[in-house]
Amino acid sequence: MSETSGEKLNIEYKQEYVSDIKKEVIAFANAEGGTVFVGICNDGAVKGVDDPDEVMLRIVNSLKDAIAPDVMPFVRVDSVAIEGRNVIEIQITTGTNRPYYLREKGLKPGGVYVRKGSSSQPMTEEGIREMLLQNSGRSFELCRSMTQELT
């Protein structure tokens, strides 16, 4: 696997486990999905992790505790060998209960993230409203107007 050529729209590298991984997972679940690699530097250099089981446990517990609604059905966390080193691969698919957000921040900018280019950005209030409408199966265009004339 030689995906280590730098971050892309659907790939994020983290040299080590840091708590902002939650933001990356939220951003991918709210967008088109993606993969976060822990143990790879931003430039693609493979560093690896010392204790993959402990890192995976920390990641899973962090995601379960910090993200609402539950994102875990759309996340897979594995230990993989890249260039002979243990790296954690977090695969995220697009969630069905979007928008996902940080519990402590709530359903507002600063709590909701989306992937834009090769970075995760806070969503605007307008973007959050749009996503809520899309996810509820309703869009503005499909809402019935009380003054609409039927032909």
Model-derived segments and spans:
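Conserved N-terminal catalytic/coupling substructures associated with nucleotide/phosphate chemistry
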Residues: 1-151
